[in-house]
Swiss-Prot record:
It comes from the Viruses. Signal peptide: none annotated. Its main location: virion. InterPro entries: CotB-like (IPR021328). GO terms for cellular component: virion component. It holds the Pfam family DUF2935. This is Uncharacterized protein L567.
Length: 320
């Protein structure tokens, strides 16, 4: 059983126990392996609403553990990539603030997720105490404020280092998504599905610029995902990526061909699953030094975790 199976199993047990306790008081009585079908079936069968009674606390812990880690890594990457002193130092300070928070509330309690781990295990969830949402929001707002300032500076044309505007904008949007997941309002299934597609497209757009110019085939593949024009490469040269895509499917992903929600979610899930596998295999090439790029192995795993988590979120939405 993998991490998210355990997470969902424990969450279900907690909800059942909570309901039993509620009923007894009223009546006077008594956290992956990609492509694993068993995993997918169990995940779908246990899908629950985020604010279902008793479940919100555990979802908050998992959201903060995941996205807090992503924010911490974003800020370290920005610190390393910036040259302008104030922005560079501010990125490091924000990084350290997240690191201290995660150390105090997660790492020091034995909750140290692996490089590809996108969800906490049942044992890890049990170790975490109550989280102060005000503290979490303070860190998120601080991060959004910093990234917003950086985006504005970069869009003005000022050179401050080796971070380009689209990368910083992508990081800002993830921070804003994190804030909404913690505080609401809840995304509708359509809103969140469209956000996932946008996220994946912009993620691949940023990744494309980090590949060595000699990696022509990989650049073409990554750019096809970024521009959502995979059909131009589908089936060519017997490459595993991209898979078979039609221009109609791409139009749906780009929002140019309005369809019912079920169709949108089906095509979006296909896109997300394929990118998750692509990110996994690309990360393995980076780890084994088979790909020329300036992508640090930590960033490769960072990207995989996001694709994997969003894929599972789409599967959950589809099961509701």
């Amino acid at each position: 059983m993998n991490h998210y199976d355990q997470y969902q199993k424990y969450k279900k047990k907690y909800l059942d126990l909570k309901n039993q306790l509620n009923n007894s008081s009223q009546y006077g009585g008594n956290c992956g392996n990609y492509g694993n079908n068993q995993f997918n079936n169990q995940f779908n069968s246990q899908a629950t609403n985020r604010y279902q009674t008793g479940g919100a606390e555990f979802d908050l812990k998992d959201e903060v553990a995941f996205w807090g880690r992503q924010m911490m890594e974003h800020l370290l990457l920005l610190h390393l990539g910036l040259d302008e002193e104030e922005l560079k130092n501010s990125a490091l300070q924000n990084h350290m603030d997240w690191k201290r928070y995660l150390t105090e509330n997660f790492f020091s309690k034995g909750v140290n997720p692996g490089p590809d781990q996108a969800f906490l295990t049942t044992n890890e969830l049990e170790k975490i105490g109550l989280l102060n949402k005000n503290v979490v929001n303070g860190l998120i707002d601080q991060t959004i404020q910093y990234k917003s300032k950086l985006v504005k500076t970069l869009n003005s044309g000022q050179w401050v280092g080796w971070i380009y505007p689209a990368m910083a904008q992508h990081m800002l949007e993830e921070a804003e998504y994190f804030k909404r997941k913690v505080n609401g309002p809840d995304y509708t299934p359509e809103q969140e599905t469209k956000f996932v597609v946008h996220h994946h497209s912009t993620e691949m757009g940023a990744t494309t610029q980090l590949l060595d110019p000699t990696e022509k085939d990989n650049i073409k593949i990554a750019k096809s995902y970024a521009d959502i024009c995979m059909s131009k490469l589908s089936g060519r040269n017997k490459k595993p990526f991209p898979n078979q895509w039609t221009s109609q499917e791409e139009a749906i992903l780009r929002g140019q061909d309005p369809v019912d929600l079920a169709t949108l979610m089906r095509i979006s899930l296909k896109y997300s699953r394929e990118l998750t596998q692509f990110a996994k295999e690309t990360g393995q090439k980076i780890d084994s030094k088979q790909l020329k790029s300036i992508i640090h192995p930590v960033l490769a795993h960072h990207i995989f975790r996001e694709f994997y988590r969003f894929t599972k979120r789409l599967e959950q939405l589809g099961a509701q």
